[in-house]
Structure formats: C-alpha cells, structure tokens
Amino acid sequence: MRSYQQVGYAWMYKNAQLGLGSLIADDMGLGKTLQVIALLLKFKEEGLLDQQQVLVVVPTSLLTNWKSELAKFAPLLGVGLYHGPRRKLPHEADVIITTYGVARMEVHTFNQLDLYALVIDEAQAIKNSSAAQTEALKSIQATLKIAMSGTPVENRLTEYWSIVDFVHPSYLGAMEDFKSRYSVPIERDNDQMVLDTFRKITAPFILRRLKSDGSIIQDLPDKIERDW
C-alpha cells in the first residue's frame, strides 16, 4: 500500500478498536477498496472472523471486481458471492459479497447471520434517507459499519446525514433537527461557524483525501487506472 493508504487503513482500524464505524470518502482512484480489504484481513488475523462474518454490499457492476481484489490482496480470506436466482448463502465464508438489490430484499436473511462488519461500497446509493433501499441497509445488524464513497455529498447535506446515520445511527440526530441545526445554516446562510462545528463533530469517523492534496500527489503513480 502507498503511505496515504496505510494511513487510511490505520485510521479505520483505530476506529474499529474504539467501536466506531468509518466513512472513507477518498477521491475515486485513491484505493478505498484496498484500504478496506487490508482492514478485513486484519480482522481475520485477529480471530474476529472465527465466529462472525463480514457482509460487503456493492453495486452489481462491482461484484466480480471485489471478488478478484480480495483474491489478489487477501487470499487468506474465504470469500463467497450471494447473488443470482439460485443464490445460496455461503455460511463458511469470512466475507460475503452481495448487491444492493439482494440486500434490500433479504434483510431477514442477513440478520440471521452474526455479522462483525457491514461494508457498503458506493454508499451514495443510500443518500435518500426515506428510500426503501436505505431503510433496508440501515436495518441490517452488525457490530461495525463501514461506508465507502468518493462522492458522499452530490447535491444536499442531507445526503451526508443519511450515510453518517448508517455508520453511526442517531449520532447527528433526527433528519429535521439536522436540517435546522446544520443544513439550513450551512447551505442557505453560508454560516462558517456552523460549518466548522459540523466538521469537528464528524471528523473522528470521516476521512476524505483528494487527488489534488499535495501529499497525495507525491505518492500517486503516473497513471491510475483502477480504484485500488
């Protein structure tokens, strides 16, 4: 891993030790997947997956990518796909990979598992807090929750609230309280004091690095072709 990726992995691991989830929101191409895989491998090495499992929820287009990346970077992890019309739950796998569509339909199935971690990739898929998909993902029980997104806010700050509420339920309060306390002052009034407060209270479990960051630029290869 590159140095900034090691920092991201260590940050997520420290959060996990404290019982905190994480939102890793690095720019696309900076290796969010690799950082999370390193974390899952650490869980395996520490015996945390001896009796529990990890569920990774991804867009359908990323199923095979996740499987191949896990095989390449963490061959010690047992990996199973749960997808397709004849899907069968891989009870012996350390890591189960499924799609948002399956997760939405089978909350009961996943809540019968003992999940140590629930990871969602492209977490902007739950930006609409009232959508059935968002409610389903938030109702899957796990000791630890990790969200990955290169675009945690696409339009409104309430999208951010929805993802943070997945990682740490109720931490930012109810949606209406969040709107009056943060969204309106920041988006409508451009209140810098409120923005500073918001950044401080979310900083412990949100990490975002950009390709334009000086320290990142120095550590990047000449060409980035994939998100790892």
PLM features: residue spans?
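ASCE P-loop NTPase motor core, strongest for the SF2 helicase catalytic module
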Residues: 1-190, 199-224, 228
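Long, charge-dense, solvent-exposed interaction surfaces that engage phosphate-rich ligands
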Residues: 195
